[in-house]
Amino acid sequence: MIKIMFVCHGNICRSPMAEFVMKKIVADNKLTDKFLINSSATSTEEIGNGIHRGTKAKLTEMNIPFTSHHAVQITKDDYKNYDYIIAMDSMNLRNLQRIVGFDNEKKIHRLLEFTNYSRDVADPWYTGNFDVTYTDIDTVSYTHLRAHET
């Protein structure tokens, strides 16, 4: 089983969007039994809060099903238990190092390093642009799935 943890600052915008987009892609390809997909935060600011209304609206617009979700913070145990820890931006990478320590197993990646882009996924909490965030996540999720198909 391939275990993927998507990570952003608060776990209410980008990482839950990535979680539910990837779950839909996996389900559409009948691979649900081969993947475990979750999301978490690097900060404690939003712990317990639900998905941001803009993320919900974008997922709904794109017919991406989502379930009840409450923000959680990533832990050292998550590092041990997941194959991929996928951060949305450079600040998330730095905060992940602070939380889980050195990435000896090369599990931690920035989302867009799976593409030809070397930029961060813009945070719609600040930009208000959930469309750009969705496009980045959707493209990379398909790319990541194709790399792991058997």
List each model region and its residues.
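Glycine/proline-rich loop-helix segments at beta-alpha junctions forming the active-site rim
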Residues: 72-131
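Conserved active-site segments centered on acidic
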Residues: 1-80
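Conserved small/polar residues in nucleotide/adenosyl-binding loops
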Residues: 143-150
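A non-catalytic, amphipathic alpha-helix used as a structural packing/dimerization or gating element
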Residues: 132-142
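Residue-level recognition of oxygen-bearing side chains
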Residues: 17, 91, 150
